[in-house]
Regions:
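Flexible "arm" and connector segments at domain edges
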Residues: 1-88, 92-138
């Protein structure tokens, strides 16, 4: 690798470090932040971290199957549908763990989702409403 490329990556690496929070760089700062959140809220940090990483990982595995099926010739077979079902099971497990970590009732989370989408779309999906949202519509 030429010096110009090495210098570029060194400069970028330094930039990344400068714009990264202390808890993302330092274990002691991370532990302090975890304790701060655990003591100042109902959030259970260990469970939430597990849930967040698990949701990301398992969703990625589900997406990988879909990608291979639609873009790389993987068959839309019963075996692959079952594989996607198993990944959805894992996603649900981590979703339930996230609800527990946040002290949320899973039924209320689902009801809130329905309420949010009904407010956004009414009786029918419209592209305009999905692209241009009202203030406060997350």
């Amino acid at each position: 690798m030429g010096n110009e490329i090495k210098d570029f990556f060194k400069t970028y690496s330094d930039f990344v470090t400068k714009v990264t929070s202390d808890p993302s760089l330092d274990l002691d700062a991370l532990m302090e932040r975890l304790k701060e959140i655990d003591t100042s809220s109902n959030i259970k940090s260990a469970r939430l971290l597990t849930a967040a990483m698990g949701l990301g990982s398992e969703t990625g595995e589900f997406v990988e199957i879909v990608k291979k099926m639609y873009l790389q010739g993987k068959p839309a077979s019963e075996e692959n549908i079952f594989h996607m079902k198993r990944e959805l099971c894992d996603i649900m497990w981590y979703w339930a763990k996230a609800c527990a970590a946040l002290d949320l009732d899973p039924h209320e989370v689902i009801a809130e989702n329905q309420k949010k989408l009904e407010a956004r779309y009414g009786e029918q999906f419209e592209v305009q409403r999905s692209e241009v949202r009202k203030e406060g519509d997350l």
